Structure formats: structure tokens, C-alpha cells
Amino acid sequence: MKRTLALILLALGMHVQAATLTLNDAREQGRVGETLSGYIAPITHDAETLALVSRINAARTESYQKLADSNNLPVDEVAKMAGQKLVARAQPGEYVKGINGKWLKK
């Protein structure tokens, strides 16, 4: 009984993990796009996409802050430099937000 329960819980855990939306999946599905601010923004506003955007942007904020601190720069400047690179590196078919605030498909 315990073994069966453990196997069921393991299978459920793998299913949840496999179903978790990744940044690459969201980009490919047109659910998120890169912005010049250095952060991703949602294109679709479902709960799964919004949770991903929050997680990714929190991690980026932490990373930008560390870079800013080590280089004695404002965090906004670091984020904008990263944003320019991320927008430029977006793959064909992915969305980026232009300086006019509109989504463009590369």
C-alpha cells in the first residue's frame, strides 16, 4: 500500500513538473515577449503565463541588481542594456515590444 501510494505521488509530481510552462515554451507559443526594459511581459493573461512572468522577472531583477552592485551602475541601466540585447536576440516568430509599445513578431 505504501509503495503504491509512493508511486502515485511520484507520478503526479512528474506530471506537474512536465506540465510546468517554461520560458522557451511561452515564447514559442506567443504567450510572452521580450521588452526593452529587460523584463518579459505577458501577451496572454492566463494564470500560468502570469505566474511564469512573475518568476522570470523576479529572477532577472535579482540578477540585474547583482550586476549593478558589482559595476556601480543603476539597476535600471543594467536592465535596459539587457533588454536591448534580449530583444535583438529574439528568434524569428517570437514577440518583442517595440519602442512604440506595440508587440512585433520577429
Ranges and model annotations:
Residues 1-18:
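Classic N-terminal secretory signal peptides
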Residues 19-106:
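Anionic, Ser/Thr-rich low-complexity intrinsically disordered regions
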